[in-house]
Amino acid sequence: MAAECGSGNCDAWAARDPSGILSPYKFNRREVQSEDVSLRITHCGVCYADVIWTRNMFNDSIYPLVPGHEIAGVVTEVGADVKGFKVGDHVGVGVYVNSCQDCENCNSSLENHCSKCVVTYNSVDSDGTVTKGGYSSHILVHQRYCFKIPADYPLSKAAPLLCAGITVYTPMIRHNMNQPGKSLGVIGLGGLGHMAVKFGKAFGLKVTVFSTSESKREEAINLLGADNFVISSDENQMESLKSSLHFIIDTASGDHQFDPYLSLLKVGGVMVLLSFPSEIKVHPENLNLAARSLAGSVTGGTKDIQEMINFCAANNVYPDIEMIKIDYVNEALQRLINRDVRFRFVIDIENSFK
């Protein structure tokens, strides 16, 4: 292997440098505190954020770095003051594991917008330790950031809900995109985009998928049940849809034009950006003259997360996943870079650390 494995009470895979190559690693998790929930991780989704931080793309990576923030597992221990969780419960942990718990955002269940929010890996927690994520055998979190998963909902499918799912669900609820009969455009058909289609159909929307790749048509229509598929570079197709959509969810990575999509919105329509292009350029008339809105969003608060999990369980909404073992994770990350996944890798943690 590329590095020493180390010692500690938790098995994991970690990146040691900006090459992003992961290899076996051991470290110590803290002891269970009064409001902690300890869980044995069974599954962890693979998010593009794992590529970004293992490779130090934002120049802030802290090595050794254990990625993973789409975590599902089984409770093994709870602190003395924990309420609502017990040993054996199925639970999930998402993008963040701490916040100040006392600011306006925290008091409004918008912990993801707390200025002291601590993310699940590569972040300095309140005790000064660096957080390490779900590519590991177990994790401890304060009960506030732990979420119940119904016993009959597969943990392998639950894992991607904790990032891909909530990143889409929160803006859809915030902007009232759950109105049956209305129309939704989804730009991009990756991990986030496919969840936008699934939520859209579950909400009773008419869903149109936009892609630059004709190869996505069959996935969009036949696999995911979208109502329409449009090649976004085809001016005639785009022109035919002007002023036809109530909502657009933009999951496309990289830089792209916004005006062609904004012109597809009806009067008062809303387009929500979930990615991070280097810049946004729009003509004001595309917004002002039709009272359209361009909004942004990132993950969701604790109330939304539990609500989303419950909604998925009640409405049979399941991410489409490809299960892998931890020793395949380097190949999986490269395939993710190459956009070669349908639609989310999930690491079978419980059968990888034996």
UniProtKB/Swiss-Prot annotation:
Binds 2 Zn(2+) ions per subunit. It comes from the Eukaryota. InterPro entries: ADH-like_C, ADH-like_N, ADH_Zn_CS, CAD-like, D-isomer_DH_CS1, GroES-like_sf, NAD(P)-bd_dom_sf, PKS_ER. Pathway: Aromatic compound metabolism; phenylpropanoid biosynthesis. Its cofactor is Zn(2+). Pfam families: ADH_N, ADH_zinc_N. Its EC number is 1.1.1.195. SMART domains: PKS_ER. Zn(2+) 2 binds at residues 100, 103, 106, 114. Involved in lignin biosynthesis. Catalyzes the final step specific for the production of lignin monomers. Catalyzes the NADPH-dependent reduction of coniferaldehyde, 5-hydroxyconiferaldehyde, sinapaldehyde, 4-coumaraldehyde and caffeyl aldehyde to their respective alcohols. Belongs to the zinc-containing alcohol dehydrogenase family. This is Putative cinnamyl alcohol dehydrogenase 4. It comes from Oryza sativa subsp. japonica (Rice).
